[in-house]
Amino acid sequence: MVLFLGTVRSTPRMTLLAPISRRSAPATSIMRLGFPASSPRRPVLRASLSSGSVTGDDASRGTSQNEQSEIIFMGTGTSEGIPRVSCLTNPLKKCPVCFKAVEPGSKNRRLNTGILIRYTGLNGKSNILIDAGKFFYHSALRWFPAYGIRTIDAVIITHSHADAIGGLDDLRDWTNNVQPSIPIYVAERDFEVMKKTHYYIVDTSVITPGAAVSDLQFNIIEEKPFVVHDMTFTPLPVWHGRSYRSLGFRFGNVCYISDVSEIPDETYPLLEDCDILIMDALRPDRSSSTHFGLPRALDEVRKIRPKRTLFTGYDAFDGSRHRKRRS
C-alpha cells in the first residue's frame, strides 16, 4: 500500500557460489536486463525482470523489444566517496586507491551508492531511481547525458542518511526545467526525518513565493509490495546499524540491498530464488557496525544462494589490483 501525501503548498500545484566467485559492481556501470547494449560499452549482466533468467556477458545476444530494461549504477561507494580529500592532502600518501581515483576514467572513483532502473513496461519506458545521495548530481552529470536519460519518473528511498537523500534538493533541475514534479516513495520513519532535513521541500509554504525548489510528491510506503510505473517493488527490511531500519528492494528477480549490517530472519524468504543479488560490502577484510564487510557478505551469499552476486558500497578498495589478480 502507498499513501500519497503530496506536498503542502501555498499555491495549488500539484550466486550459488561453490566455488565462490567474487564480483564487485564497477565504479559506475550498466547492467543489461534482457537486451543488447546500445549505449557506450560497459561491463554488463543480463537478466529478465519478468522471467528471472540470467545469461552471459555477450552483448550480441538479446531478447525481444518488449523486455528491454537495464540498471545503471549511479554510484558504488561510501558516504564520503572515493577519492577523499583527507587522503589526497596527506603528505604521507598512505592511500594509493585515492590517488588512482583521480586519474581520468579510473574505476576506483566511487560516489554514493544508487541505481537507475530503466524499465520498459506496458506503458513505455520509465526511469526509476533508487536513492539520490549527496553526490547524485555529479553522477547524473556523468551518466545521464552518456545514456540519453532526461526524465526521472520516480525516486525510491532506502533510508534517510545523507548518502541516500542528500541529493533531493538537486532534483530542482528536473522539476524546474524538464518535468513538473517527481514522485518520491519513502517509509514514514524516513519521511519524518525529511520534514527536518528538507523541510522547505516537504512544506513549500514556508519558502519565498517563486523560489526554485524541488517539486516532489511524497508517497509513504509500508513494508509491503507496491507498484511504480508497472513495476512491483518488494521492500527488503534490514538493519543498518543497531536499531536503525533500512530497506532493500526486490524488483523482478533482482534484489538490491545497499546498506546492511544484519538481515532479519523474516527477510530471508523474500530473497528466495533471487537471480541477481546486489549487496553491501564495505571493506575486503571486516564488517563495521553499520555495513557488511566482504567476509560477512560472502556468508550471506552462501545462505541466500542467488545465481549471481555483485557487491557495492566499497570503501578504499583497489578494483584494478583485484581485477589483475583474477586475470
Located regions from the model:
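Active-site neighborhood of divalent metal-dependent phosphoester bond hydrolases
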Residues: 178-182, 188-218
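Active-site flanking residues adjacent to catalytic metal/cofactor-binding acidic residues
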Residues: 130, 158, 258, 279, ...
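Core dinuclear metal-dependent hydrolase active-site scaffold
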Residues: 30, 34, 43-147, 210-269
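Active-site metal-binding motif and surrounding structural segment of the metallo-beta-lactamase
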Residues: 120-186, 274-276
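Residue-level signal for inorganic ion chemistry
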Residues: 71, 194, 309
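Binuclear metal-ion centers of metallo-dependent hydrolases, dominated by the metallo-beta-lactamase
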Residues: 3-13, 19-22, 26-37, 41, ...
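Residues in the short beta-alpha loop(s) of Rossmann-like NAD(P)-binding domains
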Residues: 77, 133, 188-190, 314-317
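Short aromatic-enriched loop/helix-cap "lid" or pocket-rim segments at secondary-structure transitions
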Residues: 82-87, 196-198, 323-324
